[in-house]
A protein has these predicted regions:
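Intrinsically disordered, low-complexity regulatory regions enriched in Ser/Pro/Gly/Thr
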Residues: 150-152, 174, 181-182, 194-196, ...
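N-terminal accessory segment detector
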Residues: 2-12, 31-179, 221-230
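Broad gene-expression machinery/nucleic-acid interaction feature
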Residues: 154-156, 199, 209-211
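Long, hydrophobic, amphipathic alpha-helical segments used as structural scaffolds
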Residues: 111, 143, 196-200, 204
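Mixed-charge, glycine-accented linear interaction segment located at domain edges/termini
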Residues: 185-199
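Aromatic (phenylalanine/tyrosine) cluster motif
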Residues: 14-26
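Beta-rich nucleic-acid/ligand-interaction surfaces
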Residues: 202-217
Length: 230
């Protein structure tokens, strides 16, 4: 289909008759207005066609799920991407933890709003239970297997997963047997704790399956004891 406006514009550009020049100028003005109208119409169509109402959706909408195969593919690609840019297992785990921290920081506010109606926890144990139950269900569709406290250190807690989904589809070569890709999950947990006002260092270890070791700052435990003493 011929574009009428472009045809008229082309004709006016290449033909010149002195007698009719006022009319040609008039025609050019009309064509310019027509072009402007067509451009505006196209822009209106572009921005209204299939208009997304994402800003109007409530944050409390039902949670969506991703297939395990899609997760396995994406996570394995993440691991390979990181592996190609490091020279040791510790560097690889650090990169995975950094990626996990980005995820944890992004999901915290929405998760607190959906699961806790915006209420933030102030006690260490309640915060850890929130992670064990709510965060784990949001990430993996189930609660974490266990939450334990170290016998000899009141700053240290453990979240234990016998068969973590994060490692289910990762094949670790013998020369890198110390690699635990749950460092990504450790990063998620560390970011959630830190951004919630519970600064801690979280690391992943092979023990009883996979264990996330959470070591809180002294200030967190001191504050918790002060709250207990009120």
């Amino acid at each position: 289909m011929m574009d009428v406006s472009s045809s008229v514009t082309t004709a006016c550009s290449y033909l010149y008759f002195p007698i009719f020049s006022p009319y040609i100028i008039y025609i050019q003005v009309i064509v310019a207005k027509l072009n402007s109208h067509l451009v505006q119409q196209k822009m209106d169509t572009r921005f209204t066609r299939g208009k997304s109402n994402i800003l109007e959706r409530p944050l409390t909408r039902p949670k969506t799920e991703v297939s395990v195969s899609a997760f396995a593919l994406l996570f394995s690609e993440m691991v390979q991407y990181c592996q190609s840019r490091v020279y040791s297992v510790s560097e690889l785990q650090t990169r995975l933890a950094d990626m996990g921290q980005s995820v944890g920081a992004s999901m915290l506010d929405v998760l607190v709003l959906r699961e806790k109606n915006g209420k933030r926890e102030t006690k260490v144990l309640n915060m850890l239970l929130f992670i064990k139950v709510n965060v784990w269900k949001s990430l993996f569709g189930k609660e974490a297997d266990k939450l334990e406290q170290a016998n000899d250190d009141d700053k240290t807690y453990y979240i234990i997963e016998k068969e973590p989904l994060i490692n289910a589809y990762i094949s670790v070569p013998k020369e890198n047997s110390s690699l635990n890709c749950a460092a990504f999950t450790a990063g998620v947990v560390e970011a959630i704790l830190t951004h919630s006002g519970f600064p801690a260092k979280v690391t992943a270890h092979w023990h009883k399956g996979t264990t996330l070791m959470i070591k809180f700052n002294e200030s967190v435990i001191a504050r918790d004891k002060a709250l207990d003493g009120r």
